[in-house]
């Protein structure tokens, strides 16, 4: 930063203080000019650190809908700026990928987001770990191909999944003081519709506590102004699947992961107990910004971004209190974050196009700002 030196008069240079310069008798001190010398550089304004990112999910179909959302996000990022994106799972329908050279890497990721020249941090979803079209989540080992693609020679370099669950801070520069810390969580082994008993590595009875301990430790150690977890499965949702602990009305099924209770337990003992700021997720194919609930510290806000391709109607639009929600339309969220504010915009596509005003500027369906 350039320092501004205000020049003083020649008298001051000679060592005479303005306070000592007086006329004869008891006259008042002589006032010296403080006008800067022409050509003196103005001080460089201090830039307010900020982070801008998009959130989308349930996208990986390689169809017209996904391509349209990808184009809309690229258009918005060109107009408003984006540092990176986060993807909330179900990155590849219906049964994930089978290798780092699977053709879906091109059809359902590289091509739809070819004009998004930013890193994208995905979470794993139930369809990423499935063997059947219902997305039962019985083959969690499949998700490891998505981890491996991060360093694959065939990758464009946009895909960032160094582990099934991990954390990163933003701004992405290692030298920057973090404004946000993101915790990418692996919810699928804790909410599988039909868990596979042979997958001992991903058994919820051991995988859940291990991930929980990591998350608690990382969240407690965070120095960031804002904390954000993102995952595929919700804690609460007004979409078709509903709230964790009763996914799809699954209370009738045997105790296990079907109802999402192990996932709810993890969130209760970490995000809810420790005051996480935001949870961003997918699984339901709509857009929601839900209010805090008493069961989760009455502080954490919940943002569902699962309209990245094919969409659905709400399951129960009144199940949880919402600031705003939209079903049956493709869309995504854009966020701008500073040390004191967290602003989110819900962008809903119309006729598979980004909605803009007469001047070509984006028109969000809903905007909310949270301050600290």
Locate the predicted segments by residue.
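Bacterial N-terminal signal peptides that target proteins for export
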Residues: 1-12
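C-terminal motif of bacterial Sec signal peptides marking the signal peptidase cleavage site
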Residues: 20-23
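Bacterial signal peptide processing site
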Residues: 25-27
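N-terminal active-site segment of His-dependent metallophosphoesterases
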Residues: 32-103
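Structured segments of extracytoplasmic/periplasmic soluble domains
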Residues: 56-62, 72-79, 108, 112-115, ...
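Active-site glycine-centered loops adjacent to acidic/histidine catalytic or metal-binding residues
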Residues: 58, 89-90, 125-126, 185, ...
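Extended active-site neighborhood of metal-dependent phosphoesterases/phosphodiesterases
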Residues: 93-227, 241-262, 266-267, 275-278, ...
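A short C-terminal boundary segment appended to hydrolase-like catalytic domains
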Residues: 322-372
């Amino acid at each position: 930063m350039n320092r501004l030196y205000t020049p003083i008069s020649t008298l001051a240079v000679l060592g005479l203080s303005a306070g000592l310069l007086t006329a004869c008798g008891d006259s008042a001190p002589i006032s010296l000019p403080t006008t800067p010398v022409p050509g003196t550089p103005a001080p460089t304004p201090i830039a307010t650190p900020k982070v801008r990112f998009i959130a989308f999910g349930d996208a990986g179909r390689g169809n017209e809908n996904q391509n349209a959302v990808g184009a809309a996000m690229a258009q918005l990022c060109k107009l408003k700026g984006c540092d990176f994106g986060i993807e909330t799972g179900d990155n590849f329908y219906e049964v994930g990928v089978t290798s780092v050279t699977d053709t879906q890497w091109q059809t359902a990721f590289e091509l739809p987001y070819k004009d998004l020249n930013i890193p994208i941090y995905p979470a794993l979803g139930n369809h990423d770990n499935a063997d059947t079209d219902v997305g039962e989540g019985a083959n969690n080992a499949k998700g490891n191909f998505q981890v491996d693609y991060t360093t694959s020679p065939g990758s464009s370099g946009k895909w960032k999944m160094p582990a099934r669950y991990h954390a990163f801070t933003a701004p992405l520069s290692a030298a920057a003081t973090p404004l946000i810390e993101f915790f990418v969580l692996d919810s699928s082994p804790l909410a599988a519709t039909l868990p596979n008993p042979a997958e001992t590595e991903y058994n919820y009875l051991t995988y859940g506590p291990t991930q929980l301990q990591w998350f608690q430790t990382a969240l407690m150690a965070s120095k960031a102004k804002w904390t954000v977890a993102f995952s595929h499965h919700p804690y609460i949702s007004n979409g078709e699947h509903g709230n964790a602990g009763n996914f799809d009305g699954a209370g009738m099924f045997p105790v296990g992961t079907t109802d999402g209770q192990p996932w709810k337990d993890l969130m209760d003992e970490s995000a809810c107990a420790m005051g996480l700021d935001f949870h961003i997720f997918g699984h339901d194919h709509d857009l929601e910004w839900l209010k805090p609930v008493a069961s989760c510290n009455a502080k954490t806000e919940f943002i569902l971004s699962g309209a990245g391709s094919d969409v659905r109607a709400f399951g129960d639009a009144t199940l949880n209190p919402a600031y705003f929600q939209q079903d049956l339309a493709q869309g995504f969220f854009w966020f701008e974050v500073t040390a004191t504010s967290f602003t989110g915009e819900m962008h809903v596509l119309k006729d598979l196009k980004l909605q803009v005003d007469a001047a070509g500027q984006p028109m969000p369906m809903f905007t909310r700002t949270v301050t600290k």
